[in-house]
Structure formats: C-alpha cells, structure tokens
C-alpha cells in the first residue's frame, strides 16, 4: 500500500474557503459589509493575521473590496 503525503492546510486557506462559500451562497450580497476582522477571527476561531490574509486573497480574487478605514465589502 502506498501512502500519500498528508497535506497541511493553512488556517487562512480555510478562512478563504468559508468566507467565499458564504459570499457565493449569497449570505453576503453585493454591497454588504463584512464583519470586522476581530469578529471574523472569533467566529472562525483563527487569529487576526489569518483573517487579514484571507481577506487579502479574496480581494485579489475580486470577491470583496477592502476600503481602508471604512471596512470590507462584497
């Protein structure tokens, strides 16, 4: 039997998957403001740096818009 290496996922990747799923399921609609980083971190049980990286990736994907000093919007 041949074993495959175990893939380690990073916390921010899981955060990206969960937030993206909520957006695609329209739990967050275009124009909606996402909760603050601190609240997302608590809900996802990850640190704020993981949330920050997830939001950066989602922004690069075009799913969200990060407005400095104003929040993050779908």
Language-model segments: residues:
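Short linear motifs at protein or domain termini
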Residues: 1-74
């Amino acid at each position: 039997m041949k074993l495959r290496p175990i893939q380690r996922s990073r916390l921010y990747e899981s955060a990206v998957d969960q937030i993206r799923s909520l957006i695609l399921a329209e739990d967050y609609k275009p124009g909606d403001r996402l909760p603050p980083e601190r609240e997302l971190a608590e809900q996802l049980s990850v640190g704020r740096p993981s949330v920050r990286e997830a939001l950066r990736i989602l922004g690069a994907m075009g799913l969200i818009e990060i407005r400095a000093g104003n929040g993050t919007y779908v």
